[in-house]
Amino acid sequence: MEKTLLHLRDITKIYDDGFAAVNKFDLKIKKGEFVTLLGPSGCGKTTMLKIIAGFEQPTNGKILYNGIDIKDMPIRLRPTSTVFQDYALFPNMTVKQNIKYGLKLMRKPKDNVDQSIYLQADKVYNSASKKANEKIKELKKQRRGLLAEIKKMDLKYQKNKNIFEIKEMRKNQYLGTLDELYQKQGINKNGKPGFLNYFKSWFSHEKLNLNDPIDREIFNLKKAYKEKSGLDKRYDKITYKYNDLDYWESYWATYPQLKKEQFENKNITRLLTKEEVEKEANRVINLVGLSARKDSYPSDLSGGMQQRVALARSLVIQPEIILLDEPLSALDAKVRKQLQDELKKLHKNLGITFILVTHDQEEALSLSDKVVVMSNGQIEQVGKPSDIYDSPNSLWVANFIGKTNIFEGHYIAKGEVEFDGITSKTDVINGFSENEACYIMIRPEDFDVVKKDEGSINARVESVLYKGLMWDIKCKYNDMIISVEGVNKVNEGDEIGLDWDDIDVHVIKKDYLNNEQAI
């Protein structure tokens, strides 16, 4: 079994305004994989990439690199390099100078280092590990204590009915509710706004008649909110301490490696010489096909050429993970396809782990070993490109990944479905019970256009559009429109037959959470 290189464990990112950009994102990535985060704009994929790179801090969760949490590790020390959508090149530097820039801090082993120095480096690491383990053990003890306090606080909220009912109430909601009560009480009958009277009564400690229902409601609300405010402050203080432990656990987890690296930088490794920098830069320039433009400035290059420079600049520092933030989205179709092919080739030849962010389904399916489909900050489905396309786990994924035709029906028996009065075979033999309601999906390209009465159904051609390699055909069957892609031309108004293979009949669960959103 291949070892996990990167485990993004239960990552959540909530901004100050309460917006959850990423919610409980959990993904394991193996060394050398090409992984794509795919989803519509605003789904959280770019935020997730920034979290991996270190440009954003997660609210919760861990970034485990070879089992060590690096979420608090400085960007320069992470095993990643990022290729941005806008290239981010230095305009005052040539292509070669841009690529050489990252090599200024790159190091390599010194020649003829005595074996005893390596043994000392191991001692430094072991000593630091011992110290780190003690610190982490102490932090875990503190975590257990704080978690117990948080549970006690939760019980306090629950035990007091009045407090529990207003637990999520914010201050402006509280003031608004009080104002409404004062309005009911008639305290503003002198023409002054009830909201102002609230402040007046608050500071004058007005006496309330607890026999009056509204006065009693005001009294209970004030009392509950005051107690809640005290609990909130205590709760926030405890949770802050609890969350702060994440930082220190992450710090001590990386501490041994950092101490060893400091020792090695001083005693074992050295910076590259000018000659070595030149040689490495030329190697990568040749690799990405920029030899003829190495002395040009970014402003003299096309978008495709500039993106090659950005990619070369990331490759030259030899990271373990390349992060690609929609690097091809601004390019025209021909250049984009060319660079897609080159990315695929580079990945195969170099064996580096690639993590790509894109909203382009075709790009994700053609480049990736693994596709991660995202929506609303969460993972909808993870799998091989063929699995995502042919076996989506929800209507939302089915509709997002390419064109599709969806029928409502039933899984009537093992390997057999029924929809719109049609009984059809399917290669789906697990995961469904007999007569279970479900959705049946058939992709447009999986229909075979045959003569009328020679297929499984007959349909009337409503429209035909030539797309180059295929004809985009819209057919009417009963009350629904079916999309078909065929190689043979048909004419509007033709009556045709449609057929399909068992393997092309895909079955989707009907109770999946996002199905309602997809209909």
From Swiss-Prot:
Gene3D superfamilies: 2.40.50.100, P-loop containing nucleotide triphosphate hydrolases. InterPro entries: AAA+_ATPase, ABC_SmlMolc_Importer, ABC_transporter-like_ATP-bd, ABC_transporter-like_CS, Mo/tungstate-bd_C_term_dom, P-loop_NTPase, Transp-assoc_OB_typ2. Residues 107-270 are annotated as: Insert. This is Spermidine/putrescine import ATP-binding protein PotA. One of its GO terms (cellular component) is ATP-binding cassette (ABC) transporter complex. Its main location: membrane. ATP binds at G39, P40, S41, G42, C43, G44, K45, T46. It is a peripheral membrane protein. SUPFAM superfamilies: MOP-like, P-loop containing nucleoside triphosphate hydrolases. Part of the ABC transporter complex PotABCD involved in spermidine/putrescine import. Responsible for energy coupling to the transport system. Its EC number is 7.6.2.11. The complex is composed of two ATP-binding proteins (PotA), two transmembrane proteins (PotB and PotC) and a solute-binding protein (PotD). It catalyses: ATP + H2O + polyamine-[polyamine-binding protein]Side 1 = ADP + phosphate + polyamineSide 2 + [polyamine-binding protein]Side 1. It is an enzyme of class 7 (translocase). It is found in: Cell membrane. One of its GO terms (molecular function) is ABC-type polyamine transporter activity. SMART domains: AAA. Belongs to the ABC transporter superfamily. Spermidine/putrescine importer (TC 3.A.1.11.1) family. It comes from the Bacteria. Keywords: ATP-binding, Cell membrane, Membrane, Nucleotide-binding, Translocase, Transport. The keyword Methyltransferase does not apply. Residues 6-401 form the ABC transporter domain.
